[in-house]
């Protein structure tokens, strides 16, 4: 059954992480030190043994000029022996229920490949972040300042005013630099990722407040976009694409004019 983890589960969770993701002990210890929060970690036990896990981490996210909370989902893993039993489906569904209960309007994750991309689509996730080759200037930020706090101040100034971007605090920045230094200052860029709208009417109202567009929402399962008689008919995934402005210039002009194209940014998530 799905339950919250406890602090006593940490070593077992680390072992699963090592088995599934093959990360170094340094990375695993760093991740758990700053990201393992028992009541934000879901596990599935069979005969007392943890066989699957999902981590949720709260971040501030800029969305249509407002700051909202999102949950970043990571470490989604099931031991190979227990896959194809719908265990991860249960963890993701429970995580969505928890987000609704906690008034978290948005979920974000990074998909490792096309197979898991298709899997997450079943749960209303859609790609809204693109990978690119633009280098994040960590080396310049570190080498041009006298303290890490000064480096963070400039880092924060780069992203603080950007819409559709996760905000990192100073502790996050310290962790980012520790991982980056351990990786021999490996070049970092923006990564591809997916989002899921958990509170569609709340987020749509932020869009309406910012733009003054006042049409109503109507939901259907099919991924199409129809605007007729002041009613926007969409799926949850389609609405997510529109609100993020993800390649909206490719849509019909009437829709593209209402939802201008943006460049959502996702990076430095201990991915």
Ranges and model annotations:
Residues 92, 99-112:
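Conserved GNAT acetyl-CoA-binding A-motif
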Residues 126-213:
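Amide-forming acyltransferase catalytic core, primarily the GNAT-like/NAT-type
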Residues 78, 84-97, 122:
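Conserved acetyl-CoA-binding loop-helix of GNAT-fold acetyltransferases
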Residues 39-43, 53, 75, 184-188, ...:
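Short hydrophobic/aromatic beta-strand element in the GNAT-like acyltransferase core
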Residues 193-271:
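C-terminal functional modules
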Residues 106-137:
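Long, hydrophobic, well-ordered secondary-structure blocks that form the structural core
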Residues 1-58, 65-68, 72, 138-170:
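Short amphipathic alpha-helix that is part of the acyltransferase structural core
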Residues 45-49, 186-190, 256:
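A glycine-centered beta-loop-beta connector
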């Amino acid at each position: 059954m799905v339950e919250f983890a406890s602090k006593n589960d940490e070593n077992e969770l680390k072992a699963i992480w090592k088995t599934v993701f093959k990360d170094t002990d340094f990375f695993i210890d760093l991740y758990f030190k700053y990201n393992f929060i028992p009541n934000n970690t879901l596990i599935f036990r069979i005969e007392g043994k943890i066989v699957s896990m999902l981590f949720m981490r709260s971040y501030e996210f800029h969305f249509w000029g407002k700051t909202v909370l999102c949950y970043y989902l990571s470490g989604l893993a099931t031991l190979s022996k227990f896959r194809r039993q719908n265990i991860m489906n249960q963890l993701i569904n429970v995580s969505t229920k928890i987000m609704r209960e906690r008034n978290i309007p948005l979920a974000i994750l990074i998909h490792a490949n096309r197979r898991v991309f298709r899997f997450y689509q079943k749960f209303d996730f859609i790609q809204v972040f693109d990978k690119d080759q633009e280098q994040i200037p960590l080396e310049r930020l570190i080498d041009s300042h006298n303290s890490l706090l000064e480096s963070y101040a400039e880092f924060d100034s780069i992203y603080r005013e950007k819409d559709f971007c996760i905000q990192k605090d100073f502790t996050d920045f310290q962790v980012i630099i520790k991982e980056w230094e351990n990786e021999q200052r490996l070049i970092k860029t923006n990564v591809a990722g997916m989002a899921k709208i958990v509170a569609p009417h709340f987020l749509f109202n932020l869009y309406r407040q910012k733009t003054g567009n006042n049409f109503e929402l109507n939901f259907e399962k099919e991924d199409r976009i129809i605007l007729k008689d002041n009613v926007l008919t969409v799926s949850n995934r389609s609405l997510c694409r529109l609100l993020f402005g993800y390649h909206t210039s490719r849509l019909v002009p009437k829709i593209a004019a209402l939802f201008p194209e943006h460049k959502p940014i996702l990076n430095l998530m201990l991915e």
